[in-house]
Amino acid sequence: MVRGRFAPSPTGRMHLGNVFAALLSWLSAKSQGGKWLLRIEDIDPQRSHREFAELIMDDLRWLGLEWDEGPYWQSERGDIYEHYLKVLADKGMTYPCYCTRADILATQAPHESDGRVVYKGTCRNLPPDSRRGPAAIRMRVPEEGEGIVTFTDGHYGPQTVDLTSQCGDFIVRRKDGAWAYQLAVVVDDALMGVTEVVRGRDLLLSSPQQIYLAGQLGFRSPHFIHHPLLCNEAGQRLSKRDRSLDMAALRERYAPEEIVGMLARAAGLQATDAPITAADLLPAFSWKKIETADLTF
């Protein structure tokens, strides 16, 4: 059985882009007769707030996007992440990193496409007597040419990524002790039996890192399906800074069926903005109808 999930971070009110991701994830799982899980990714103690999580759940119910399991809270799963971090450490797959953001930026110019900076492995082979102060924990990736990850995205097709040249050794625990996204999401997806991950294409490059990490932990990776982003007329992706498009503002102006209808039209699932419930949209759902280019809303 397909087991999809929606995993929002409670750092603010959901905006239309978040709702789009939730709707597509729900439609994809439910159209296959599957289950849909809700996981609250509240591992950042400085930015996550319980009240935002409660609002997210209220908004999902209001939109007709009911979940079958959860909510699961990442903030309650630290002991589990600790166990799997030790598994990696015992295999010699991790090391402490003392570099600051400024240190890393100074070693290499950002990739022109998205501003990423590939970590050069400065701390990878530091002798023990050089290891002082707070440290992040990084996951080793193979030497260049040996870390090729290939997978087929459910919407964007075959993907090939060289982890060494395109990603570098990545963080699995932050310097402040908080758990990094990559470790938490891989462990949770595996232990929760998630078989399908639907999310925005801005997270496409996270997939090879997660596939590699899952393999090192003996987990089977879910099927990844990335979707185009919703953008404004200037081509900028929608974000939580767009207060006019967050759920507080949208609920004052529209009924849930109107919001679903507008998103369905943007996705190419229907020809107009005609109001429709998420459940009534299920027969029309197909990934083949959705463009790969970002969508203007």
Where are the regions a protein language model picked out?
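N-terminal Rossmann-like or analogous alpha/beta NTP/dinucleotide-binding catalytic cores
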Residues: 1-112, 201-202, 206-219
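Structural motif
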Residues: 14-16, 176, 253-258
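Bulky hydrophobic/aromatic packing residues
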Residues: 26, 36, 43, 60, ...
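Alpha-helix boundary recognition
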Residues: 86-90, 190, 251, 264
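Active-site cores that bind ATP or allylic diphosphates and position pyrophosphate for catalysis
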Residues: 102-239, 246-250
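Active-site neighborhoods of enzyme catalytic cores
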Residues: 49-159, 166, 274-297
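Catalytic adenosine-cofactor/nucleotide-binding cores of aminoacyl-tRNA synthetases and other
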Residues: 100, 205-206, 216-297
